[in-house]
Amino acid sequence: MSNATIDPQRPVGELAREVPAYTRVFEAADIDYCCGGDASLEIACKQAGVNLDDVREELADIQTDDAQAADWDNLAELVDDVVETHHQYLREELPALEGLVRKIARVHGENHPELEALQTAYLDLAPTMKEHIREEEEEVFPIIEKLDRGESLSEGERRRLREEIEEMKADHEDTAELLERIAELTDGYTIPADACPSYESMIERLDALERDTHEHVHKENNVLFVEAETKLSDGVESRNS
């Protein structure tokens, strides 16, 4: 398949939404398709320092017939997926990983002074993510589900949903910065030569946390919130017609 079939001006978030398997290519190339999903493929490649034509070839090689996106027209189903797949993972992993990060910093800190900064970054990240998913489930998702059912929203609910979506996107940016800091402190999740099995596990789980967060944020920023804002706009147009 020619790489000409992949338009370099299309936003990377839109491409990932259309073909979820593209995210494997984006992850490998360190292309930000979640918080930076509005950037065109061309711009995203420049930002990541990778060759555009090489990335287009890799994307074109993916068999899209076997990798189409799930039908997320039903936003309630997408909300359920986010909660059951990503929020539940965070509820279990964040506290467990915190204990491991503390242990590794204590045991290996003398030989790896960067672990103190890593622990600080993680202890900033974990409560932020916990509060974020609580707010989504209690404040944001109920309004989206009501909107998805076709129920009428008050002006206050419409305004609050728009404000909450912007706040959630800002939270995602803050989370991305902390994860980027963790990635830097671990040299891109490189396992040190003197790492014990627990140290190795910590690195692997931090890497997995970042990858899951990329997918999580992509589903919200580029699918759920986009569709919710479209429904809000359609509702305004319907009432004004």
Enumerate the language-model features and the residues they cover.
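Small-residue-biased structural context
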Residues: 1-241
